[in-house]
């Protein structure tokens, strides 16, 4: 326990909270350009080929972002919107690409959780009629 004199000499330091998505610079999303689209394998108990992209953001950062959903149309030089959110079994992947915006198409034939994968209601109705 410090004395009053010690507290006068130097006040208590505020503990600063470390951000989980520093590349977004306190923004909800950031635009970026795909530099490389590839697959990576997850950590130990899981097995898959997860689709990821290396993205250069408008904030100047270069990050690895996960491409959610089944199938995608992303290639090099595609303009994408990146949000925060890590992938637990991929070390170093702390961002997600937003589906259905800019150059990223929504997931085909998606009926449930459509808003998370950029699918409009009209698209699902058209697929149901066929």
Swiss-Prot record:
InterPro entries: NA-bd_OB-fold (IPR012340), Ribosomal_uS12 (IPR006032), Ribosomal_uS12_bac (IPR005679)
GO biological process annotation, one example: translation
Keywords: Chloroplast, Plastid, Ribonucleoprotein, Ribosomal protein, RNA-binding, rRNA-binding
Gene Ontology terms, MF aspect: rRNA binding; structural constituent of ribosome
GO CC, alphabetical: chloroplast; small ribosomal subunit
PANTHER family: 30S RIBOSOMAL PROTEIN S12 FAMILY MEMBER (PTHR11652)
Job description of the protein: With S4 and S5 plays an important role in translational accuracy. Located at the interface of the 30S and 50S subunits.
Name of protein: Small ribosomal subunit protein uS12c
Organism the protein comes from: Tetradesmus obliquus (Green alga)
Source lineage: Eukaryota, Viridiplantae, Chlorophyta, core chlorophytes, Chlorophyceae
Name of the gene encoding the protein in the UniProt record: rps12
């Amino acid at each position: 326990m410090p004395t009053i004199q010690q507290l006068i000499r130097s006040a208590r330091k505020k503990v600063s909270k470390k951000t989980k998505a520093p590349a977004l610079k306190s923004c909800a999303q950031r635009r970026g350009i795909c530099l490389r689209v590839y697959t990576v394998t997850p950590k130990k108990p899981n097995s898959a080929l997860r689709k990821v992209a290396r993205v250069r953001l408008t904030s100047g950062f270069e990050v690895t972002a996960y491409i959610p959903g089944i199938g995608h149309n992303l290639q090099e030089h595609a303009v994408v919107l990146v949000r925060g959110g890590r992938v637990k079994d991929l070390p170093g992947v702390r961002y997600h690409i937003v589906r259905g915006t800019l150059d990223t198409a929504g997931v085909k034939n998606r009926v449930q959780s459509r808003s998370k994968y950029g699918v409009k209601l009209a698209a699902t109705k058209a697929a149901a009629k066929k």
